[in-house]
Amino acid sequence: KISKACLDQTATSTASEIVVFVTRQDLYRSRARFVLDFERGNVRRNSPRERQEKRIKDRELYYGKLMPFLYARFFGILGFLRVLLTKAIGLFRPIVREVSEGDMRVVVHKSCALAAQTFMIAMANEGYDTCPLEGFDSKQMKKLLKLPHGAGVNMVIACGIRDGNKGIWGERGRVLFNEVYHRV
């Protein structure tokens, strides 16, 4: 069924395992509390005493106030207000400007994609092959996995040990390095 939701791509039908990376923007409050609790202990264990109070206060500001402010959603209205606020603040100092509800969705998916990349590198380190798939029916995938409304499917990764050259259709094509890299 997962293979069908992935548009019957060969990698899904030949893979030993399929890993689906899911975003949960709806859990931002509990995740922020979890990270804040962890960071308080982390600072107490690893920071000099004279710096602990300020570092804990900084984490409380970020995870207790800023994260809930950035990730809260309400029919696009909160995102619009954040955009107006950042435009005003941005007149006087540098500020992160990607704060609309759509922007925050992109941030969540980008963070999840970085976790997926780390997963694929770790799998390669253990001798396994991976194939990330972006072509899939996200609505069907959510239904198959019984994911809640607030969840989003970020990426599907086929995993296993390659069977020779099966599944390899030809040479890889890549954009030239100097077309995507610019030294500043």
Regions found by a protein language model. Name each.
Residues K1-V184:
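Acidic, surface-exposed loops and disordered segments
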